[in-house]
Each structure stands twice: as C-alpha cells, then as structure tokens.
Design a protein with these regions (language model features):
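Extracytoplasmic/lumenal domain signature
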Residues: 1-146
Length: 146
C-alpha cells in the first residue's frame, strides 16, 4: 500500500483528478475530502447535517459537485475546498434525497437523480438553474453503486 488515509466515517466514491489528487465523501462525517497523491489531506469541506452518499463529479474547470441526504447540491473549488454555490432541491424530505451519483454532459449540464424519482438538469457554469422531470416508478437511487 502506497498510502492510507482515514476519514471520520464510511468513505464513498473516490474520484481522481488529472494530477492524482483524490476526492471522496464520507457518510458519517458528512464531508468531502481532498487528499493529495501522496496521501496528505489538502482540505475538508463539511456539508450540512445530512449524511453524504453521493458520488462526487469533477468538471473540466476543476470544480467538484456533490449532494447530500437533504437534497442540497454543492459546487466546490477543488484547489482550495471553498464553496462556490449550493442549491436545495425541491420536494419533501423523502423525494429530494440525493443517494447516487451525478454526471456532467457535454452541454455543461449537471444531471442529478433524486430518490423520489426525479432527475434534474442544472446549468453549472451559469450558476444553478435547473429543469426537473419525473421518471415513472420513482426511486432513482444507487445508479453508480448498486
């Protein structure tokens, strides 16, 4: 093992940038971590009080996006861990939870699925502006891990 980093809770969904930095969320600590390619903590961003299960995603400008169990979506600067913006999803606690991954399309849209059966498309470089649509059957969760 080259290095080992211990988070405050269950570590989920590591992603790696072009220079080898690793970013991951931890459920118990409700945080997003940045760890250097040699295993040293670069920064830690603590989200609100909800557990964080969502796979983060990195855009071509170096911004990281992730969500938590309340449906809040964060945009974080990967160089320093500072919050760029956040937005709250619409809906009740049950159908607004973000329990899976996100993806970024070629059109610079962030696509997010919610446990209540909705998928949102959010313009990420112009600030949060979204359109939402429902999926028959509901409960879109675990798309990247189940």
């Amino acid at each position: 093992t080259k290095w080992n980093f211990e988070a405050n809770g269950d570590a989920y969904a590591p992603i790696v940038d072009k220079i080898g930095n690793v970013y991951f969320v931890d459920k118990g600590g409700k945080s997003l971590y940045a760890v250097s390619k040699d295993g040293q903590l670069k920064w830690k961003f603590a989200s609100e009080s909800a557990p964080t299960y969502c796979f983060p995603v990195l855009d071509d400008k170096g911004n990281i996006y992730f969500g938590n169990g309340t449906g809040r979506i964060y945009a974080i600067d990967s160089s320093n861990g500072e919050e760029l913006w956040h937005m709250d999803s619409e809906g009740t606690d049950n159908n607004a939870k973000i329990m899976s991954g996100m993806t970024i399309g070629d059109n610079q849209m962030l696509y997010v699925s919610y446990i209540g059966g909705n998928v949102a498309a959010i313009k990420i470089f112009a600030g949060p502006e979204k359109s939402t649509w429902s999926c028959r059957g509901g409960n879109i969760h675990g798309t990247n891990q189940y």
